């Protein structure tokens, strides 16, 4: 994990432009309960796992590679008293063994890059949930297409429209049964906390060899968000469901 993310997300309870209420709504859409077993891939600082375990009493296997995030997740899970429900596993998501039909639900929120994009993520996660189970992916999408002249996506931003995003679920054999989209407030809260945290970090680490790089990177991200991305880029959790009948492609 780039050190950049450990700095700018050091105060984020949720590391995506969403809210605690929307994560709990996700749990309702996936019909979670005490008997449910959930896989949370690239789980970061453990925000969604913590909320779902507390709200629904479900078991969660959280997979995260970055020790900086896992350290925080361990502390949060213990403090919340749900360490008997949340299993934290340090592993590269791509290399984590996904047993067929082991889970009732699988999440990948803001981390489809683990499998090189949305289609790869759905292909990896769908077989890991039982028939009738759920796959939820939080993914950016373009609000407008084609993109306006003068705007160039960053490398790796091969996102599509919301309709095309849902279509990829259907192509993976999943029926779209839920959509939880981020509001403008969700986006502004998420992005502007980056700005505050980075400014405080730069003030406290002015002699750090990466300070100039981080300052310039933060300036560029802020300007691009305010000029372009705030209007162009959406983010949503799309929930797909596997067919009930065994043997149907998923």
PLM features: residue spans?
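Short, glycine-/aromatic-enriched active-site segment of Class I SAM-dependent methyltransferases
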Residues: 137-157
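A short acidic, Gly/Pro-enriched loop at the edge of an enzyme's catalytic core
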Residues: 95-106
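A short glycine-rich, Lys/Arg-flanked "PGG" loop and its adjoining helix->strand segment in the class I
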Residues: 119-134
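Conserved Class I S-adenosyl-L-methionine
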Residues: 180-250
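Conserved alpha-helix/loop element of class I SAM-dependent methyltransferases that forms part
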Residues: 16-34
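A short SAM/SAH-binding and catalytic strip from SAM-dependent methyltransferases
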Residues: 105-117
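Short alpha-helix
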Residues: 158-173
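Class I SAM-dependent methyltransferase SAM/SAH-binding core
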Residues: 39, 45-95
